[in-house]
Amino acid sequence: MSKTATLADTVCHTSTENLDLIRGGSLLAPALATMQEMPFGRDTTLRRLLPQIPDTYDFVFFDCSPSLESLFNINVLVAVQYVLIPIKVDKNSIEGYNVMLETIQSVREIANPDIRALGIFMTAVETGASLDREMIANFPQMLPELAFHSYIRKNIDVKKAP
């Protein structure tokens, strides 16, 4: 995104009806580099830019890496109302959701009083694995107020994709 381009200029229309994307990588890299150089206000950049996106969207989703140290991820947390938390069926992800909930609480207290955890869902689930089947059965009872009953299966074809 150049200094003259707006966030709306980066919206890519897809062949799927009612689905547009803002691609990361090369399009967002210059904006992220610019944010890194800002002396102040860099954690609120996205919140200031979001009004540039047309009101034609009911939802705007940001797909973030698991790192809570990323400037982009911090910007997202400061800008959004709701957070969907994906977890894999592994020790790090299961322990990490508590850290994420604590982070959301901190962001709510300091920078974004509107942020809430909307829910937690399992991803990369291998339904043939006994641990994954056990998690599918017990997950809703573990987090009754946040757990989604649906999950995303692990798909090897996604890993093979270019």
Feature annotation, model-predicted:
Residues M1-P162:
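P-loop NTP-binding core
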